UniProtKB/Swiss-Prot annotation:
Chief location bin: cytoplasm
Organism: Enterobacter sp. (strain 638)
Pfam families assigned: NAD_kinase (PF01513), NAD_kinase_C (PF20143)
Keyword 4Fe-4S in annotation: no
Name assigned to this protein: NAD kinase
GO biological process, one term: NAD metabolic process
Job of this protein: Involved in the regulation of the intracellular balance of NAD and NADP, and is a key enzyme in the biosynthesis of NADP. Catalyzes specifically the phosphorylation on 2'-hydroxyl of the adenosine moiety of NAD to yield NADP.
Listed GO MF terms: ATP binding; metal ion binding; NAD binding; NAD+ kinase activity
Record-linked NCBIfam families: PRK01231.1, PRK03378.1
Enzyme Commission number(s): 2.7.1.23
Cellular-component GO terms for this entry: cytoplasm
């Protein structure tokens, strides 16, 4: 064992027995190598582990040096919103579909992870968005997002009329099905499907992507990540929502605005030493291949 990491947390909500097997193999492998291991409570219960140190996501964030998320991108997003609040590094083993954020191949995870534990890794700081639903600047509901904050109708699809202010200066108005406000991390997710640009992870930028705008001139807009975005609504309705990473929904009531800004904290995401963002674009999303 080395001194790069002492306590390692195992997190992620398994959707099938294969993923659960990966959790168990990882736990026993780390214990055999002499690491202190914390297991998320739900995983420990499902594996029926005895005499194991367990904790919530927050407790793992407070006590562990590294969190290994086993699952797909959804598992990573759910865990990352909590773990980003703490001084902990995060890496993922892919047991989902795409696995854009979970780098490690489950069939070769032990060797890749061994290299990471020896200190051979690439570190990135990924910023989050904070979304507030407020009335007269009095905060009412708040959440965070790694990928994106999306304005959309609640249950029935319909046109929304709204205004967008950037740093309290009017930017544009729009009639559309909604708006995607994305981080660079989220630029390869929902934003990409809506025609948004790909932003490399190190950019300090936020992209605003219209969803089915009722105009021929609407285009995605890229702004500085230090900007504050305010959404105001002209026709008051009680069925609008914002969703964070497609996992948390906040309702918007009549007379309320939405404020979106960069979080004060960030996610410490790490990758194997041979990680390449552009190779990931190619292998996961079919980005153009080399010609020679």
């Amino acid at each position: 064992m080395n001194n790069h990491f002492k306590c390692i947390g195992i997190v992620g909500h398994p959707r099938h027995p294969t993923a659960l097997t990966t959790h168990e193999m990882l736990y026993r492998w780390l214990c055999a190598k002499g690491y202190e291991v914390m297991v998320e409570q739900q995983i420990a219960q499902e594996l029926q582990l005895k005499n194991v140190k367990t904790g919530t996501l927050a407790e793992i964030g407070q006590q562990a040096d590294l969190a290994v998320v086993v699952g797909g991108d959804g598992n990573m997003l759910g865990a990352a919103r909590t773990l980003a609040r703490y001084d902990i590094k995060v890496i993922g083993i892919n047991r989902g579909n795409l696995g854009f954020l979970t780098d490690l191949d489950p069939d070769n995870a032990h060797q890749q992870l061994a290299d990471v534990l020896d200190g051979h890794y690439i570190s990135e700081k990924r910023f989050l968005l904070e979304a507030q639903v407020c009335q007269q600047d009095c905060q009412k509901r708040i959440s965070t997002a790694i990928n994106e904050v999306v304005l959309h109708p609640g249950k029935v699809a319909h046109m929304i009329e709204f205004e967008v202010y950037i740093d309290e200066v009017f930017a544009f108005s729009q009639r559309s099905d909604g708006l995607i406000i994305s981080t660079p991390t989220g630029s390869t997710a929902y934003s990409l499907s809506a025609g948004g640009p790909i932003l490399t992870p190190s950019l300090d930028a936020i992209t605003l992507v219209p969803m089915f705008p009722h105009t021929l001139s609407a285009r995605p807009l890229v702004i500085n990540s230090s900007s504050t975005i305010r959404l105001r609504f002209s026709h008051r309705r009680n069925d609008l929502e914002i969703s964070c990473d497609s996992q948390i929904a906040l309702p918007i009531q009549e007379g309320e605005d939405v404020l979106i800004r960069r979080c004060d904290y960030h996610l410490n995401l790490i990758h194997p030493k041979d990680y390449s963002y552009f190779n990931t674009l190619s292998s996961k999303l079919g980005w153009s291949k080399k010609l020679f």
